[in-house]
Amino acid sequence: LQCYSCINQVDCTSVINCTXNQDACLY
C-alpha cells in the first residue's frame, strides 16, 4: 500500500478519508 496526498487523487484506485492535506489515497 502506498499513500498519496489528496491532490493526487487521480492516481488513486480508491479514496478513503481524504481531508485537508492529509494522505488518504490507498492502493
UniProtKB/Swiss-Prot annotation:
Membrane is among the record's keywords: yes
Principal subcellular localisation of the protein: membrane
GO cellular component, one term: side of membrane
Cell compartments where the protein resides: Cell membrane; Secreted
Disulfide cysteine pairs (residue numbers): C3-C25, C6-C12
Record InterPro entries: Snake_toxin-like_sf
Subunit structure: Interacts with T-cell surface antigen CD2.
Name of the protein in its database record: CD59 glycoprotein
Organism this protein belongs to: Ovis aries
Gene name of the record: CD59
